[in-house]
Amino acid sequence: QPTIVRFLMENLMKTIEITLGDMEKRISRFRALKPLPIQQDPEIPQEAKDVVYARKLLSVIGLEGDANTPINNSSPITGAAGMTMTLAVCPPGQGPSLHAHQQTYETFTVLRGRFEVTWNDDGGGSVELNEFDTISVPPKVNRAFRNIGDDEGVLQVLITGGVHDMADIDMSPDVAVKLDRIKTGVKQKFAAMGLTFNAHKGAAA
């Protein structure tokens, strides 16, 4: 027993020290964050972007490795044991439409303002969240959120578990209808980056 304890103390419980330069790679500065690249595409009407995303989706932490996702491509920090973090900034009344994550949990914490979170295929489940309230939505459940305050609101969004890629996110079928009404071809823009529009309990497996 003493030998095992000594081994653990000498090998597994050691600390490391890193430089300021190394730690800077683990710091995200809010003022330096920019919306996802597709949110800056001038060919996509703002109305269409608002159907799919928060007005500004700011990537804070991306996955380790070379995962090619919008969050990874713009995050200042990479690698946090499989967790990703974004900040969803929404003007009053705005928020993304119903969508499901097939494998991952999505956890929302209100950092500023008041939000309504809805869930299920018809959005029939509903709860209001105030500052610092948190809700964690499990995989395969349709969910949406909307700023119900009078000022700009901010949600912290954590994605954990499962595989974090575009195949994990599936929009509700009515999102495709909304996009087609806004502008011909805009749905295909989102589909080209991997979004699908089949999130419904009646969808084919």
What is each stretch, according to the model?
Residues 2:
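Cationic, low-complexity basic patches in intrinsically disordered or flexible, solvent-exposed regions
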Residues 6-82, 187-205:
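A short, N-terminal "cap"/entry segment at the start of jelly-roll beta-barrel domains
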Residues 11-16, 144-205:
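Double-stranded beta-helix
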Residues 66-73, 86-101:
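Conserved short histidine dyad/triad with adjacent acidic residue
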Residues 73-79, 96-102, 119, 126-128, ...:
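Short histidine-centered beta-strand/loop micro-motifs
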Residues 95-97, 116, 133-135, 139-145:
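Histidine-centered metal-chelating micro-motifs
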Residues 103-116:
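Glycine- and acidic-residue-biased ligand/ion/polar-headgroup-sensing regions
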Residues 121-138:
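Short acidic-glycine-tyrosine-enriched beta hairpin
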